[in-house]
Amino acid sequence: MFSASSAVVALLLTATSRVLAQDVETTPTPVGCETLLQRREWRTLADSEKLDYINAVKCLQSLPPLDPTLTAAQSRFDEFHALHLEKADLVHVTGEFLPWHRYYVKLYEDALRNECGYAGANPYWAWEQDADSASSISGSPVFDPVTGFGGNGGPGTYSLPPDTDITANRIDPDAFVGCVQDGPFKDYTLRYGPGQLVTDHCLTRNIRDDSAQFLDSKAMAEATQLPTYEEFRIELEGEPITPTHKMHDGGHYGVGGEMSNFYSSPGDPLFYLHHSNLDRVWRMWQLMLPDRLYEISGRSTVDPPYVNVTLDYPLDMGNLAATIPIRDVMDIWSPPNCYTYV
């Protein structure tokens, strides 16, 4: 039976789709951007475009690091991975969670384009399309062994290092079922993780369908109807390593393995598609009311003492890029972003 609550969710879904359509269809090229890169959903890309993106990621994994003094880093991809390990405690469950990751993914996109000749934009994985279906998430095109990122881990093909402190490293042992068995990254060696460990190991996964409830269109609609940035951010992000999962944690745990880890999740290239979709949901929320474009709030750290996050709060990207204030990344139609979602 179609309930009143179902009707509300349906209306919210219609509203969010209309807002996202407006992002491209009714907006002229913004001042300051020569053009807008169009971030598209993975399954809408032609096979050749998917392979171009995968090859660009593999290129980044083969380029030497810009900072030769960075411990264990052997590639530009490693440099991005290492920064997340360093900053994770500061950029999760805080007000800067969304703007920090927006800038982080943008820098990754820039590296793919400027250093590896990639002509497109960073794609996103609209996991709500997979969560809404009756099929397993493992059937998503992002897990295709040829035109995707490979599938599941093989049981028993990976073991955590002896004496690993799973609490300090926020590791869920059940998520690390084994090494990815197919696809373009099955033989790639990660230098960082799990957690804050520095160890050479394979890319691991344990794809789980029980996370679908946090990734469906209903969850997205419920988040975007919240009135304040802080309420929206909490509903989208959730709390790490607790039963209170939301879209952010649901995507990480749905993939499992390295992606499930609070610190080392960017070791899985799917991280950047997952966070592009989270950024897209934030963009939906921003566009619903004019005052939301520059609305920011929240604490600067999980534990006191902390300050309130404001538009002037610095986004520290370590050796990847200059530190800039949050206000500079709030509008994706302005530099340094200059992209949109289609």
Stretches found by the model and what they are:
Residues 20-342:
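Intrinsically disordered, flexible peripheral segments
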Residues 1-23:
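Fungal secretory targeting signals
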